[in-house]
Curated annotation (Swiss-Prot):
Active-site annotation: P2, E3, K60, R272
A GO MF label: zinc ion binding
Catalytic activity: Hydrolysis of DNA containing ring-opened 7-methylguanine residues, releasing 2,6-diamino-4-hydroxy-5-(N-methyl)formamidopyrimidine; 2'-deoxyribonucleotide-(2'-deoxyribose 5'-phosphate)-2'-deoxyribonucleotide-DNA = a 3'-end 2'-deoxyribonucleotide-(2,3-dehydro-2,3-deoxyribose 5'-phosphate)-DNA + a 5'-end 5'-phospho-2'-deoxyribonucleoside-DNA + H(+)
Gene name of the encoded protein: mutM
Record note on quaternary structure: Monomer.
Coiled-coil parts of chain: none
Function: Involved in base excision repair of DNA damaged by oxidation or by mutagenic agents. Acts as a DNA glycosylase that recognizes and removes damaged bases. Has a preference for oxidized purines, such as 7,8-dihydro-8-oxoguanine (8-oxoG). Has AP (apurinic/apyrimidinic) lyase activity and introduces nicks in the DNA strand. Cleaves the DNA backbone by beta-delta elimination to generate a single-strand break at the site of the removed base with both 3'- and 5'-phosphates.
Protein name (database record): Formamidopyrimidine-DNA glycosylase
Species name: Prochlorococcus marinus (strain NATL1A)
Cofactor comment: Binds 1 zinc ion per subunit.
CDD domains: EcFpg-like_N
Keyword Hydrolase part of the UniProt annotation: yes
Length: 282
């Protein structure tokens, strides 16, 4: 699943390439891609005849502002890519490929296409009279953004002080911190030198400081590399993310640790494959 760096890469592409994109027509090829009330008909009626304005990211959600030709608000287009969702910008209309789910056409002929092999991705229209969390309930449950002032070691110490689950499990919980998934949880814990099986409540203040610093560091590096592509992720122009080649533990089970030479382990923690070094992460 695309995590924060991949979603941020898509957000940057959408904002850069679609700042003058006027949606004249929409085709919904898969009804389940539309999650807002009223289904595809209501979605099309509310989103067409709109300019795509600024794009924001909240956790793994993309939030695009919709504007009239007079630049008044028409609400928001909210997207969650889930496992395999991706956007592709085409300079002219071409036949839809097999996994095309939603197509946005502009008056000049360009097409913004939403492709989703697994078909778990979702879209919502949020009217200007409502807030995004009112319509997209998952956003209400998100913890702080890693780059926000609200995310720090003091917050983690308070939030985790009674949590008996592993720190790996806590990082994957979007209520702890928004946008982190398996790749960056593993890489962060390695960088911070923390055993992923450690009970969250047992982490000391200095370890939580390292954890915060490592998470921000790893996410910034990955954003700079356009995210990670191991299977389906592509940016708006079809390019791969380049962080995967820099990963120190993720998908390196059985290989030598680049820091100490110990074999990288892979085991299930909280039902997820976890990669870590037993020497560097004690």
């Amino acid at each position: 699943m695309p995590e924060l760096p991949e979603v941020e890469t898509v957000r940057k592409g959408l904002e850069k390439l679609l700042n003058d994109f006027y949606i004249e027509r929409i085709e919904v090829l898969k009804e389940r891609s539309i999650a807002s009330n009223g289904g595809s008909k209501s979605f099309i009626d509310n989103v067409k005849n709109s300019y795509l304005g600024n794009w924001e990211r909240r956790g793994k959600y993309l939030i695009g502002s919709l504007l009239t030709k007079e630049k008044f608000s028409k609400g928001f287009l909210v997207v969650h890519l889930r496992m395999t969702g991706q956007f592709k910008l085409l300079e002219k209309e071409v036949l839809a490929c097999k996994h095309t789910r939603v197509r946005f056409f502009e008056e000049r002929g360009r097409e913004l296409r939403f492709i989703d092999i697994r078909n778990f991705g979702q879209m919502w229209h949020v009217p200007s009279s409502r807030s995004v969390p009112e319509i997209v309930s998952g956003i209400k449950r998100l913890g702080p953004e890693p780059f926000s002032d609200d995310f720090n070691s003091h917050y983690l110490e308070e939030y985790l002080k009674k949590k008996t689950r592993s720190i790996k499990s806590a990082l994957l919980d979007q209520r702890t911190v928004a946008g982190v998934g398996n790749i960056y949880a593993d890489e962060t814990l390695f960088d911070a030198g923390i055993n992923p099986k450690t009970e969250s409540r047992n982490l000391k203040s200095n370890e939580l400081k390292r954890l915060c610093n490592s998470l921000i560091k790893i996410l910034n590096i990955s954003i700079g590399e356009g995210g990670t592509t191991f299977s389906d992720f592509r940016d708006l122009e079809g390019g791969n993310g380049n962080y995967g080649g820099q990963a120190l533990v993720y998908r390196r089970s059985g290989k030598n640790c680049k820091k100490c030479g110990e074999k990288i382990l892979r085991e299930k923690i909280c039902g997820r494959s976890t990669h870590w070094c037993p020497n560097c992460q004690k």
